[in-house]
Regions:
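Walker A (P-loop) phosphate-binding loop of ABC-type ATPase nucleotide-binding domains
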Residues: 36-40
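Helix-to-loop junction immediately C-terminal to a conserved catalytic motif
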Residues: 49
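Conserved ABC ATPase "signature" region
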Residues: 97, 101-104, 109-127
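Catalytic Walker B motif of ABC-type/P-loop ATPase nucleotide-binding domains
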Residues: 156-160, 165
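ABC transporter nucleotide-binding domain
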Residues: 172-260
Length: 302
């Protein structure tokens, strides 16, 4: 079941145009929406979750008109926002039971079965009696997924889910999302390139409300093969290199600067070909849009 987004635009009262004729087709599986903070990702997530209205455009999930059939859509939707509140003095088991009741699971025995199944699925069953205030960031995120999965949603939206997680929690959380993507449409909004490269079979890059690229990550990387060159340079060399070549990113390496250049031919003496990755795709797509300073983020430890 595809999620089809057509010509969706949104301008806020202060004049900021958050989305500009966004057009995407999102198939079943993991789909990554990648972009910097302020790119319009969260606005699109809220619109898809029926929490906000676009100014124009249409959205369909299969035959369902998302904008005009909100109640029907919400029955099939799971949403994990970037930030959400929890009751710190309530246990995970008790709060999930309460949410299941609100979701329409009326029978006590049925709720007990649902709660146990979900807490086991997100690996929180052994700590079900623990108060949520004592949960780590990763545990809270996994509890949020359990809430989002109430009602067996056909579509799951997760907004910046790994921000602030330690490496081990991040791996557990991404593995959980990968399992969910086998049977559902899972839309992952993130500014972390590794999240997309490790999980998603399709992706889009968004900036300033515009879709700049829509592709399969592996194919996008392959299209850069033979075009990425690298060389360690001094800071003093960088301005001239930027004037003469398409420098897509720089990274400090042992006190010196490692520059990546996108070019069909060797940019100059000392440059060597580099194996492209999804970071190169991202920075090549964003080149010229994020200012002169394009520092490559430190990789997230596995």
């Amino acid at each position: 079941m595809e999620l089809r987004i057509r010509d969706v635009s949104k301008t806020y009262p202060n004049g900021v145009q958050a989305l500009k004729q966004v057009d995407l087709t999102i198939p079943r599986g993991m789909y990554g929406l990648l972009g910097p903070n302020g790119a319009g990702k969260s606005t699109l997530m809220r619109i898809l979750a029926t929490l906000q209205e676009p100014d124009e455009g249409s959205i369909r999930l299969g035959e369902l008109d998302v904008l005009n059939q909100k109640d029907e859509l919400r029955r099939t939707l799971g949403y994990l926002p970037q930030e959400f509140g929890l009751y710190p003095k309530v246990s995970a088991e008790a709060l999930l039971d309460h949410f299941a009741l609100l979701k329409g699971v009326a029978g006590r025995r049925a709720r007990k079965e649902v709660v146990e199944a979900l807490l086991r699925q997100v690996n929180l069953w052994e700590v079900r009696k623990q108060k949520l205030g004592g949960y780590s960031g990763g545990m809270r995120q996994r509890f949020g997924v359990a809430v989002a999965l109430l009602g067996n949603p056909k579509r799951l939206i997760v907004d910046e889910p790994t921000a602030g997680l330690d490496p081990a929690e991040r791996v557990r959380f991404l593995n959980l999302l990968s399992e969910l993507g086998e049977n559902s449409v899972v839309l992952l909004s993130t500014h972390i390139v590794e999240d997309v490269s490790e999980l998603c079979t399709r992706m889009a890059i968004i900036d300033q409300g515009e879709i700049l690229l829509e592709a399969e990550p592996l194919r996008a990387v392959e299209e850069l093969r033979g075009r990425i060159w690298r060389r360690v340079i001094s800071k003093a060399e960088l301005p001239q290199l930027e004037r003469e070549h398409r420098v897509i990113s720089t990274k400090l390496l042992a006190g010196r600067t490692l520059a990546h250049v996108d070019s069909d031919t060797p940019p100059g003496p000392g440059f060597e070909p580099a194996e492209p990755d999804l970071e190169d795709v991202y920075f090549s797509t964003m080149a010229g849009r994020i200012g002169r300073r394009r520092e490559r983020p430190e990789p997230v430890a596995p």
